[in-house]
Curated annotation (Swiss-Prot):
It comes from the Bacteria. GO terms for molecular function: DNA binding; DNA-directed RNA polymerase activity. This is DNA-directed RNA polymerase subunit omega. The RNAP catalytic core consists of 2 alpha, 1 beta, 1 beta' and 1 omega subunit. When a sigma factor is associated with the core the holoenzyme is formed, which can initiate transcription. Transmembrane segments: none annotated. GO terms for biological process: DNA-templated transcription. It comes from Caulobacter sp. (strain K31). It catalyses: RNA(n) + a ribonucleoside 5'-triphosphate = RNA(n+1) + diphosphate. Keywords: DNA-directed RNA polymerase, Nucleotidyltransferase, Transcription, Transferase. GO terms for cellular component: DNA-directed RNA polymerase complex. It is an enzyme of class 2 (transferase).
Length: 119
């Protein structure tokens, strides 16, 4: 079989950068054990991924959504901790009795990296 070229794939995915991302993601999926949608023909995983894109046997939008999901980094544990800390601060009445000067010092301390005193 003839080698696949980028020009064959650009007809299916017009943006070359998106093509690189999609084909690399598909090649990683193949390396991880995903089933092949075309015959391997002794080709390496990136070439197989490009052939799948060129032959239009892979769902481009589905592959794009999978790629976006894997690139997103959401640390839900940290978000939950921050929300709990905010709720605890709102429930604590002592910060409501803080003077304006104390508030400014606390904010400057946070800004300066936690230093309590300036030298």
């Amino acid at each position: 079989m003839a080698r696949v070229t980028v020009e064959d794939c650009v007809e299916k995915v017009p943006n070359r950068f998106a093509l690189v991302l999609l084909s690399a993601h598909r090649a990683r999926g193949i390396s991880a054990g995903a089933s092949l949608l075309v015959d391997r023909d002794n080709d390496k995983n990136p070439v197989v991924a490009l052939r799948e894109i060129a032959d239009d046997v892979v769902d481009h939008e589905g592959l794009r959504e999978q790629l976006i999901t894997t690139l997103q980094r959401v640390d839900e544990h940290t978000e939950a901790e921050e929300e709990a800390e905010t709720l605890a601060l709102l429930a604590d009445p002592t910060h409501m009795q803080m003077s304006e000067l104390e508030l400014v010092r606390a904010l400057q301390s946070d800004r300066d990296g936690g230093q309590e005193e300036r030298y």
